[in-house]
Structure formats: structure tokens, C-alpha cells
Amino acid sequence: SKSVDRVVFEHVSFQYPSADAPTLKHIDLTFKNGEKIAIVGENGAGKTTLIKLLCGLYAPTGGRILLNGKDTATIAKNSYFDLFSAIFQDYYFLPMTIQQNITASLDYDREKFDLALQKAEMYDKVYALPKGTDTLMDRNVYKDAVDFSGGEKQKLLLAKAMYKDAPILILDEPTAALDPIAENQLYLKYSELTDGKLSFFISHRLSST
């Protein structure tokens, strides 16, 4: 089922194959449903490594990660990935329509899609475009594609996360491209929209949290 009671890191270590020393060493952490967790640290401090372990993109080189008491190594990858909506700092939109980028499919729930756009405050902007949700993205590929600002792209990523509606939400440096005021507004929005979920906010700026 798509419910998460708790996630536990038990003595987790991780070392990249080419590294001389572990990035993370004997980490013990417990995260419970409904918590909002801020992970703050300098670049290279292991923040993203921790999150990729949590998401199942990396496997621990020591220790284990438990979901509701079950070792995540024994859970089928696809069903585990379904538990996460993640917005990573290096995410790029695909050269497809706005609708396809947000819903990741041709067969989608229109009402849920519109609600996700509204929550992310992009509904009016998208529907004001001549082709609306069928507008193509990525001007490098299509000359008639829409060119959204950094802040608008972040809001569309938020809409994508809202549409997936997974129990664990991860925002990895989602505001790096924004000025402090816009960043603060976006974090307040994230905080409001993540009520009832286990959410992680990763930043290298303490002010963001």
C-alpha cells in the first residue's frame, strides 16, 4: 500500500566506488510520517547521497534502510519508487508538452492535473498560452516551445510532484535559481502543500529552512 509510517536508517554507510573514504558513515536516523525534515549542509557534505539512498537510487555499502520495518533491499524497485515524488536540482524537462511533462503519460486525470497546476500557481499561466497544456517545452528542440523562467519551472516541478501525490516528497535544492524573496515564498508554498506527507527539504543555505 502507498502508506509510510516510518523510514529508519540503521548504521548506514555509503562509499562511492572510486572514493578513498565513505561519504556517509554509520548513520542512524528515524523519519516518521507527517514530519518535515530540513537537510542543510555545504556542497559535497553528502546531502544528495543521503537522499539518493533514501529513494533507493543507491544501495548502502553498510547497514540497511527499513520502510515500515521492512528492509528496502527486499522491496521491488517499482513499488518502492512509487512512494516518492522527488524534485532534484539537476532535473530537466523533456521536449514534450506541458501536460506530458507533468503527468508522465498520455492517459491522465484532467481534474487532478488542473488541481496540481492550481496548487503550484501555474494554472492561469499555462492556460493563457495559445496551445494551453499542449504547449511544447524545450526551445532547444522546438522553436515554437515556451520558455519558462527559473521560478516558473520550479513551480511546474512542484505541480509534477503534486500530480504524482506520493507519500514522501523530496525537494533537493529546489530554489537554487531564485532570489531570496522568491525562494522564501516557494518554501512556504512547499510547506503548506506537504502537510500529511513525509517531506524532505535539502539546501546549502540555512536561511531557507
Q: Which functions belong to the PLM regions below?
A:
Residues 2-209:
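ABC-type nucleotide-binding domain
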